[in-house]
Regions:
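Active-site beta3 strand of CheY-like receiver
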Residues: 48-54
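Short hydrophobic/Thr-rich beta-strand motif most characteristic of the beta2 strand and flanking loop
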Residues: 29-36, 44
């Protein structure tokens, strides 16, 4: 399968999670890049110019909440849609994701069809 679709940046400190999401994305025809924490995500977002970012909430160095806030404050990256991923499905986490600027919120574990549908909804494709 040719992967010429939009580039998705996967930000998660867990290698297995990044590879699993990458496999889901490849199956749907998306390209993907990865970052291991929020700090690296800031750099990769500026250099790779992804169409969308999947952001884990809990990571070392800089968590996803802070990374999303900074990405949305930066004129160079504020236009990039973000989907926040977290193991916590509580309403307060959904509200926090919206407050920091995430465009969508998914609770882990994320099913492949659920992830693909949410990406397509956010990207309007």
């Amino acid at each position: 399968m040719s992967h010429s679709g939009p580039l998705i940046l996967i930000v998660d400190d867990n290698l297995d999670a990044r590879e699993m999401y990458g496999m889901y994305l490849e199956h749907e025809g998306f390209r993907w890049a990865e970052a291991v924490n929020g700090h690296e995500a800031l750099t990769r977002a500026r250099t790779d110019r992804p169409a969308l970012i999947l952001m884990d909430a809990t990571m070392p160095r800089m968590d996803g909440w802070e990374a999303v806030r900074r990405l949305k404050e930066d004129p160079d990256t504020q236009h990039i849609p973000l989907i926040m991923l977290t193991a916590h499905a509580f309403q307060e986490h959904r509200e926090r994701a919206a407050h920091v600027g995430a465009d969508a919120f998914l609770a882990k574990p994320v099913l492949p069809d659920q992830l693909a549908a949410e990406i397509r909804r956010v990207l309007n494709i």
